[in-house]
């Protein structure tokens, strides 16, 4: 992760599992309580199911072709104060489109501002960042991630990654998650 993405995480801030799917679900059940709200774009892969299985409420942001089927800060902003989790994926499954640097930075700025606004007795706003397809970017498409753009988000971002897509080995179910140690520890338990 450090040599490819420039992110610095200790080994105890990683969790390895049989693919990305159990890690996404572990993130949901670790961070969310019944009735919490989750923001995610549509189309997207299985966030509706994870939200349902976690007994949470969905806030679906319908993406638009003119935005490359990626959610924008303007679309997310009206819902941000009521949410506990924003589930993002870049490149996005199923469209294959990716965040531009500026579009992701704007969403990150919303999360930074919202977490500063929240009182200590409120849950923070987290980002689940599924980047399983990041190695499959070509040409002028570049991969960006929240903590590289806004290091102050480090305590609020849980990454999902894996090797099956990058190596065209979809039968090899190896995924990893990394993020704040206290969250990864809860996911492990």
Where are these regions (language model features)?
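Glycine- and other small-residue-rich loops at beta-strand/loop junctions that grip anionic moieties
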Residues: 96, 125, 161
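Walker B catalytic acidic pair
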Residues: 131
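Short, conserved active-site loop motifs that form the nucleotide-linked donor/cofactor pocket
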Residues: 14, 125, 157
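Conserved core of the PLP fold type I
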Residues: 1-122, 134-151
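Conserved core segment of the aminotransferase class I/II
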Residues: 150-189
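Residue-level marker for buried hydrophobic side chains located in beta-strands
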Residues: 90, 127-128
């Amino acid at each position: 992760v450090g040599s490819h993405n420039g992110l610095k995480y200790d080994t105890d801030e990683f969790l390895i599992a049989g693919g990305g799917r159990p890690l996404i679900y572990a993130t949901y059940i670790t961070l969310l309580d019944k009735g919490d709200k989750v923001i995610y774009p549509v189309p997207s892969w299985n966030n509706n199911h994870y939200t349902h299985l976690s007994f949470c409420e969905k806030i679906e942001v319908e993406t638009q072709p003119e935005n490359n089927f990626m959610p924008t800060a303007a679309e997310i902003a009206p819902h941000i104060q009521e949410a506990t989790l924003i589930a993002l994926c870049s490149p996005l499954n199923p469209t294959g489109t990716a965040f531009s640097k500026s579009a992701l930075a704007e969403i990150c700025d919303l999360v930074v501002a919202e977490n500063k606004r929240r009182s200590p007795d409120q849950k923070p706003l987290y980002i689940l960042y599924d980047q399983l397809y990041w190695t499959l970017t070509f040409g002028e498409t570049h991969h960006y991630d929240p903590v590289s753009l806004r290091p102050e988000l480090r305590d609020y971002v849980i990454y999902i990654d894996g090797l099956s897509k990058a190596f065209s080995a979809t039968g090899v179910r190896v995924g990893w998650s990394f993020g704040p140690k206290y969250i990864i520890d809860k996911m492990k338990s």
